[in-house]
Swiss-Prot record:
Residues where Mn(2+) 2 binds: 260, 262
Cofactor detail note: Binds 2 magnesium or manganese ions per subunit.
Top EC group: ligase
Residues binding Mg(2+) 1, per UniProt: 248, 260
Cofactor(s) listed in the protein's UniProt record: Mg(2+); Mn(2+)
Ranges where the ATP-grasp domain occurs: 104-287
Recorded superkingdom: Bacteria
UniProt GO cellular component terms: cytoplasm
Binding positions (Mg(2+) 2): 260, 262
Name of the coding gene: rimK
A biological process term (GO) from this entry: protein modification process
PROSITE patterns membership: ATP_GRASP
Annotated protein name in UniProt: Probable alpha-L-glutamate ligase
Amino acid sequence: MKIGILSRNQDLYSTRRLIEAAESRGHEVKVIDALRCYMNINSEKPQIHFKGEELINYDAIIPRIGASVTFYGTAVLRQFEMMNVYPVNESVAITRSRDKLRSMQLLSRKGIGMPITGFASKPDDVKDLLDMVGGGPVVIKLLEGTQGIGVVLAETRKAAESVVEAFMGLKANIMVQEFIKEAGGADIRCFVIGGKVIAAMKRQGAEGEFRSNLHRGGSASLVKLTPEERKTAVAAANIMGLNVAGVDLLRSDRGPLVMEVNSSPGLEGIEAATGKDVAGLIVDFIEKNAATKGTKTRGKG
């Protein structure tokens, strides 16, 4: 098969591993920087050009689109879909999951466990909003943040009011969530491929750090999932319509709570913690599914 990887840097661990996995199975692979693609959008023969050449005869595309280039990256992916190239994750599923608020609303509609989450536009509503999520401590998140950037723990109500008002003053969109103390600064990353959890790791925040992101110095270890955690992770990925997803859960007194559903989960941490060939499993999934050559929008909203 001829497989394209939408990635801006072929030296990244995840991109390198996907190239290795595909080539070792006899596939032809090309890394394509979405920002260097330009498109001919027409109803006869839609085209994508990359650095002067037309991209043709691709069987599948693996999107590894960074958060900062979501808009253009998903436009390029959508064009591949118009050309009948099989996407590992569809453009609509990626945009759905990238919008933190929209994804929380979709999960809540299906009754998936999550931290109580508040969203407001005006500083006048901050006091009511904090009452809604249970006062302090609360976690305040920038809707556009990634890798733990733009996430603040406000230990007291007073601190929460100050932080929310400061963000609002910058015209930033934020959501306010209850702090799950019993999680102890740890979360669980479940790696879902094709409706199954194929690997999971526990990420523990560094000393004195409530964020467990590995980019923030957290550590990863193997974890055994409960049946409920497994079911929750698969359901969250399905609601987003993602074939490949990293679902982040917190262990709480009321069961697993979904923090985020990531459409472009990194491979380095999960492969190191579990010893599994996750890149190979993604390519296996493509081999089984790309032959249908169809894209079908899954999930709703």
